[in-house]
Amino acid sequence: VITDPLALIRAAHFAATLLASGTVFFAVLVIGPVRSSRNFPRLRERMNVLVWIGLALSILTGAMWLVWLAANIFGESLTDVCLHGGAWSVLADTRFGWICCLRLALAVLLGLLVLMPTHRVWPVGAAAAFLVLPAFASHAGATPGPRGDVHLVSDALHLLSAGAWLGALPAFVLLLWTAHRARKPGWHDFTIKVTRRFSWLAVLSVGALLATGILNSWNLLGGVRDLWTTDYGRLIGFKIVLLASMIAIATVNKFHLTPRLPTRAAVHNLQRNSLAEIGIGFCVLVLVGYLGRLEPTAHVHPATTLIPPDAAFTHIHTPEAMADVTINPGRAGRSAVTIRVSREDFTTFAAKDVRLVLDPPAASGKSFDFIAKQQPDGTWAVSDVALAQSGLWTVRVIVIAQSGETIVLDAPIVIDR
């Protein structure tokens, strides 16, 4: 896990996303309201370059993330998933892929909007959307019901807070570096005003980060004990320690160094401390990259049956019911499908009827609809299913409860060649 390339790609992508969005927040919300900012057009140009660098890196790392994820899903090389359509299946048939397309459009739009300094609302709105959309493809976006909605809102606020503070730090360092070298009248007063505004934005962001971080941990951990007994919990614990060190540095910046502006020593120390915060913040993002590769302890489900080594398997979870779907063998050709329907406490769900619908990859053919037969052990089975092609299929389980209620559960499933 330590050398997992996908985790590092995720970290780099989040860093680039925070850089682009955070720089927009800093330029519009912190620098923009300061009247004297109009006297420094060169600074605005440098901020725009910083945004474009972040957007370019986020597009590059986003494409790498998509291809690497497709390779992991299909168990193929990077070259094969690019040449044989695996990456396209992930892009066209999954929520993650749709979000990638939407964020690509937002990146292009944001890159153009920063050229229009008179418009403040649109760049901030585009930057915020670009920043929070990954939450819809995260654990929060996959959690069903009201609890999932709360988790999703919390995740979005967590990302916005990180962007307003950590993402804006490179722009703040750029401002301090420019101020340190400037000889132009008005720079000192301008730097003091901007630093004070940013310090208050940082205070609000830290408060929101702590509140949403606690809520997210409550949703993702099975209990406090998981912080030292599980890999997932230990990574969250390390993240908390790093965040605490960043808050300590930010406290020194606000209460010790900011009042001493505009002395050169204060500017130099603020710049040095902000660079330290950026370094620690990137370490936090690396941990986030690895956390996304692990199953949250609150989401770990006990295996109800032994999954055959050649089978394709997916677990579908909704507030009304859960389904474990096993396709054996999990490759193109003829297979048998076993469906176990249960409640959230893993007791058997008393269903009147169960139907199985299989949708082929990228709408490349007609759907297959089957009536499942109940087995003596309580599972439901469909025999002799002909899977015409490999790729990312969509499985839908339609459960008719004893009360007559219809419950639809759907999820992607990978069929090998």
Language-model segments: which ranges?
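A generic local structural motif
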Residues: 342-343, 367
